[in-house]
Amino acid sequence: MASQGTKRSYEQMETDGERQNATEIRASVGKMIDGIGRFYIQMCTELKLSDYEGRLIQNSLTIERMVLSAFDERRNKYLEEHPSAGKDPKKTGGPIYKRVDRKWMRELVLYDKEEIRRIWRQANNGDDATAGLTHMMIWHSNLNDTTYQRTRALVRTGMDPRMCSLMQGSTLPRRSGAAGAAVKGVGTMVMELIRMIKRGINDRNFWRGENGRKTRIAYERMCNILKGKFQTAAQRAMMDQVRESRNPGNAEIEDLIFLARSALILRGSVAHKSCLPACVYGPAVASGYDFEKEGYSLVGIDPFKLLQNSQVYSLIRPNENPAHKSQLVWMACNSAAFEDLRVSSFIRGTKVIPRGKLSTRGVQIASNENMDTMESSTLELRSRYWAIRTRSGGNTNQQRASAGQISIQPTFSVQRNLPFDKTTIMAAFTGNAEGRTSDMRAEIIRMMESAKPEEVSFQGRGVFELSDEKAANPIVPSFDMSNEGSYFFGDNAEEYDN
């Protein structure tokens, strides 16, 4: 899809690169991974973690969060200007778990942010290495997407819980740059824009003065990012209308919600990247693997191969199922929270079940949870096959957007049928005459009505054996037509905002 204006691949966005060829991209992504790995090794040394403790995903999350917090300039500045009781703006830390006398103990550590920044830069040849920071943000975002269903956030902005498959990246920080924007779903962008418009409605000065000018530039930039995710001319034209509005208000909110609904059938293009926890990269670097020299890609076989050979552990609460915890993390590592469960199951080689049937809570452990009963177990993150990550939304005939899957935002470029009940979705569009009635709306509705369920997405694309590194022999799985496997639908997963 070159029509996004910028013809940079996702690896280039990931590494802020100029135009690079494939080898250079693989090297620069590898360099980023090396840096994360070296940083992680150094932090494990500082914290005196054993090999097992260093491979504990909860410790990995704490260490990742510390470095992200150390580089969060806006928040650091805010904390210094608004000192709050008991928070030292110059320090960062979190829970580190250690094995003492055959029991898990929680230890709260605190470090100077300056010191963490020094260790990070040292691991990254003196650079700030923003790409590596963004990579960790996307890993946290993918984990959140897999763990929580954001119904409440959707309802608050006037959207419908059925739009949860559009919410990829909804917890990514604003500062996540081009790589972050690439992985945000249509619903996430719509939600950010609606929040902004609502502030403008409630606060007269939001669009005014010097600050208002910056706000306006941010608004238009977000509109352009969202426009670039749509694949049909009518959807894009509507985005132009929203962007050019003199004084964005309820009409724009209505248009945006209409566009979000339309994206359930006319899928947007959203990137998927396999971002792994730092405790996977650390041991790989420690074992002497040179990611920069070997090259690495976030959208090919590399993450699968890395996970095949990694040992990662997790703390397990008394009534949690370790296999279910493994599924949660497997999905996060492969950015598969919104993928069809039939496709995920085939690739993983074991059945992937919906969120509501998983006996597991999130990966993070709250500070008030009792450690006495905590066990730990190995996470099973291996796969039977591998597949290429997609960003097309499943619409293979780009000339006229064919239908994508309704409750799904595809992750893998694998052929699948579209067993969707279009009537339920189309019902959402009747009698919604608020906002504007325009030719564009009529055109979008017409396209959705003519979208054919019989068409398959990703025609001829398949999965590959792990020995097939060059993706030479695609295996096209055949799926049971009867039901589309949505991870969240009809489900009561925990809320992210709790």
UniProtKB/Swiss-Prot annotation:
Molecular-function GO term, any one: RNA binding
GO biological process terms held by the UniProt record: symbiont entry into host cell; viral penetration into host nucleus
UniProt biased composition (Basic and acidic residues): 8-21
Top-rank lineage group of the source organism: Viruses
UniProt motif Unconventional nuclear localization signal: location: 1-18
InterPro entries reported for this sequence: Flu_NP
Keywords from the UniProt entry: Capsid protein, Helical capsid protein, Host nucleus, Host-virus interaction, Ribonucleoprotein, RNA-binding, Viral nucleoprotein, Viral penetration into host nucleus, Virion, Virus entry into host cell
Protein name: Nucleoprotein
Gene that this sequence comes from: NP
